[in-house]
């Protein structure tokens, strides 16, 4: 894919409006800024958001030098990222004006069946877990969800930067190879957008 289009959070939130009725899932909340952007533009849709708020785990894959993806990065109270609230309670407080958001403090590797969260048919997904291992778990969770067509935003796609070859793109490629889902990548820039059909 040669295009360098970027799937900004604003563009993603707007494009969801044109999708069929259904729910939205977000993996990786951190500061809740993307959660808020999606929620406020799609008040008629339920948004199910997941994060354990402990920051990044250690990855077995090579990390891009300049990404800042060390273990614990982006956790609540991370002094390197003052826009992230100091506590999980602070994240819940930021999301209070958005009753369509269902926030779950859970590790993506340990998610239960989608029915236990009340997730209905899914139409859109925001993946912002950065590294390979949690991205694999997020995509495996989607296999258990009810959906026909998904619009998936990958926050750290970096379609033309080989330093990121071992993370979201690798997990997505392996998922597509394993499942045989049909797909298109209309946005292949640093933030990717993919349409997937079952």
Please give the residue ranges for each predicted region.
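Conserved SAM-binding loop and adjacent beta-strand
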Residues: 1-9
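S-adenosylmethionine/decaboxylated-SAM
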Residues: 10, 14-198
């Amino acid at each position: 894919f040669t295009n360098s289009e970027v799937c900004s959070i604003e563009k993603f939130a707007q494009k969801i409006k044109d999708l069929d009725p259904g729910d939205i899932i977000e993996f990786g909340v951190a500061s809740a800024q993307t959660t808020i952007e999606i929620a406020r533009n799609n008040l008629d849709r339920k948004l199910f958001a997941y994060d354990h708020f402990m920051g990044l785990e250690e990855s077995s894959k090579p990390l891009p030098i300049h990404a800042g993806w060390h273990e614990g990065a982006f956790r609540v109270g991370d002094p390197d990222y003052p826009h992230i609230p100091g506590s999980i309670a602070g994240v819940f407080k930021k999301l209070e004006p958005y009753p369509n958001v269902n926030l779950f403090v859970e590790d993506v590797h340990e998610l239960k069946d989608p029915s236990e969260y009340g997730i209905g048919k899914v139409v859109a997904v925001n993946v912002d877990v950065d590294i390979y291992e949690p991205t694999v778990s997020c995509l495996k969770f989607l296999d258990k969800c009810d959906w026909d067509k998904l619009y998936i935003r990958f926050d750290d796609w970096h379609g033309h930067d080989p330093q990121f070859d071992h993370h979201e793109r690798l997990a997505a490629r392996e998922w597509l190879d394993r499942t045989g889902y049909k797909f298109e990548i209309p946005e292949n820039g640093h933030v990717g957008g993919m349409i997937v059909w079952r």
